[in-house]
Amino acid sequence: MSTPNPPATNSTTSEDRLLCLTILGYRKQGMSEEAYRKHMIEHSAPLTKDLMIKYGILRWTVKCPDRSKIHNPTETRELMYEIMDPQMANIADYDCFSQVVFRNFEDYKKIKDDPWYKEHLVGDHENFADTKRSKMTIGWITQFIDRGVVTEGFEGFPGPK
């Protein structure tokens, strides 16, 4: 099977790539994995979802044992030993990987500026997260496969405003 020829120019545009904020989180010291997961799913997520929709967030995922979100408990981290090889030899020890996907950086900044966010969510992070050890990064994401099908960008996502 031959591989397709790459395009002559970089065809990535604002229509087929999105920004993704990734939070590599640690749970608060002394908190169990189960208590962390429960707080994220039953308290933090319900508080956060509507605010994200209000400001145009396209996708938010959190890695946890519950099927709707994903955390990185010891149980699943140990699966890495089955696929480790010389290229994939370092296992991340974060408790949570949260990703927020949006088209416009200003949309995410509006969330952080929202008075409701400041009143209800900023302080809540201290209840479950080790905010001193957790890390963040942001970058463009481009989609190549969606639900088992090769795609061109983000078909079906709302276009730029």
Swiss-Prot record:
Keywords: Lyase. It comes from the Eukaryota. One of its GO terms (molecular function) is lyase activity. It holds the Pfam family EthD. It is an enzyme of class 4 (lyase). Disruption phenotype: Impairs the production of monodictyphenone, but leads to the accumulation of endocrocin. Its EC number is 4.1.1.-. The keyword Ribonucleoprotein does not apply. Gene3D superfamilies: 3.30.70.100. Pathway: Secondary metabolite biosynthesis. It catalyses: atrochrysone carboxylate + H(+) = atrochrysone + CO2. Residues 29-131 form the EthD domain. Transmembrane segments: none annotated. The keyword Lyase applies. Belongs to the tpcK family. Decarboxylase; part of the gene cluster that mediates the biosynthesis of monodictyphenone, a prenyl xanthone derivative. The pathway begins with the synthesis of atrochrysone thioester by the polyketide synthase (PKS) mdpG. The atrochrysone carboxyl ACP thioesterase mdpF then breaks the thioester bond and releases the atrochrysone carboxylic acid from mdpG. The atrochrysone carboxylic acid is then converted to atrochrysone which is further transformed into emodin anthrone by mdpH-1 and mdpH-2. This is Decarboxylase. It comes from Emericella nidulans (strain FGSC A4 / ATCC 38163 / CBS 112.46 / NRRL 194 / M139) (Aspergillus nidulans). The lineage of its organism: Eukaryota, Fungi, Dikarya, Ascomycota, Pezizomycotina.
